[in-house]
């Protein structure tokens, strides 16, 4: 049994192996990991949501040690067994049934690709961003800034206030942002500009995406910017008019260098086209790695890292995580550290 395997590991001085044995269990996947990922998939950040393709894909990635820094770029999707209603672009029935039938995700999830299952062209696929659940929550209506803001919140552990920097160039702020809200330009110069100057050039990567509420499906219009990018374009006509899905990371300058952008390898370009390359930029930052560790620490230890010892442990876990981006290992390391607490 799992318990006897854990006991043997602990008695032989191998607590990390004991933690891995504990994860070799349906509850780790169906309960712990489902609840871990669920809040990232909706605007309310609620854990009380049905299983969906975003959650299942996170669970599968962790199970299979898929490097987690590909979270926003990998052409990947996890589905349940063939006995379920087939995966649909138009509803969540496949995953609702997977959950209703209590199928063990440790053995029942199968890896496939989004392009094969959804018909999205391969260059449109951007990891969990292009799952149906993420599109329904964050590409619906609006201006597609939500997908970016909730990624910052859920995966870089920073909301827009924390990355506010009024000193950056404002040349890619869209036309819908009034330069004198309520007739007062000081409000823009001291407040609005500090988020939009960094967010708008990055969120340009999402220019071809929309979630169609009538059909219940994600849309990708290659080469054609979604109309939502021109909402309220008369607010400030000299503002930036989105022409394609190019993006630029202005946060590589100024105070937001502290997010620790990659200087070489994946995610080090600083600019590009499309969501997947922008996803690599975010997921290879120090902020992404430390955020995953912080979330795992809290999920396992039931508290944030709070004292010097906790913070030192978190730093060790970040270094270990960046060596292979294996989330399961991060869970195991947190479990060993908080064992008996």
What function would you assign to each model-found segment?
Residues 2-22:
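Active-site-surrounding "flap" and adjacent substrate/cofactor-binding loops of secreted or lumenal enzymes
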Residues 17-202, 283, 287, 297-300, ...:
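Extended surface/linker regions that mediate inter-domain or inter-protein docking
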Residues 20-21, 134-144, 178-179, 185-187, ...:
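Electron-transfer interface patches adjacent to heme c in soluble/periplasmic c-type cytochromes
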Residues 171, 213-215, 341:
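Alpha-helix boundary/interfacial micro-motifs
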Residues 204-209:
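Short cysteine/histidine-rich zinc-coordinating motifs and their immediately flanking basic loops
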């Amino acid at each position: 049994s799992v318990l006897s395997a854990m006991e043997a590991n602990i008695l032989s001085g191998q607590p990390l192996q004991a933690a891995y044995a504990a994860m070799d269990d349906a509850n780790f996947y169906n309960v712990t990991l489902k609840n871990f990922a669920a809040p990232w998939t909706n605007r309310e950040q609620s854990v009380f949501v049905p299983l969906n393709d975003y959650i299942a894909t996170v669970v599968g990635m962790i199970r299979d040690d898929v490097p987690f820094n590909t979270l926003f770029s990998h052409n990947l999707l996890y589905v349940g067994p063939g006995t379920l209603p087939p995966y649909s672009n138009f509803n969540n029935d496949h995953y609702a049934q997977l959950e209703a039938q209590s199928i063990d995700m440790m053995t029942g999830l199968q890896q496939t690709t989004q392009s094969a299952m959804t018909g999205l062209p391969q260059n449109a696929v951007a990891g969990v961003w292009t799952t149906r659940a993420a599109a329904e929550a964050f590409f619906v209506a609006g201006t597609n800034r939500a997908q970016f803001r909730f990624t910052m919140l859920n995966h870089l552990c920073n909301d827009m206030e924390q990355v506010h920097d009024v000193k950056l160039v404002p040349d890619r702020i869209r036309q819908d942002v009034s330069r004198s809200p309520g007739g007062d330009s000081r409000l823009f110069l001291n407040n609005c500009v500090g988020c939009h100057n960094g967010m708008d050039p990055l969120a340009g990567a999402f220019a071809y995406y929309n979630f169609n509420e009538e059909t219940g499906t994600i849309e990708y219009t290659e080469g054609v910017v979604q109309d939502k990018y021109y909402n309220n374009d008369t607010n400030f006509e000299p503002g930036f008019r989105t022409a394609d899905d190019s993006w630029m990371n202005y946060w590589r300058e100024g105070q937001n260098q502290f997010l620790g952008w990659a200087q070489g390898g994946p995610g080090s370009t600083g600019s590009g086209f499309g969501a997947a390359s922008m996803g690599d930029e975010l997921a290879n930052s120090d902020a992404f790695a430390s955020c995953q560790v912080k979330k795992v620490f809290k999920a396992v230890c039931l508290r944030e890292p709070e004292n010097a010892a906790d913070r030192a442990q978190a730093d060790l876990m970040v270094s270990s995580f960046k060596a292979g981006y294996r989330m399961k290992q991060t869970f195991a390391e947190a479990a060993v550290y908080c064992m008996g607490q």
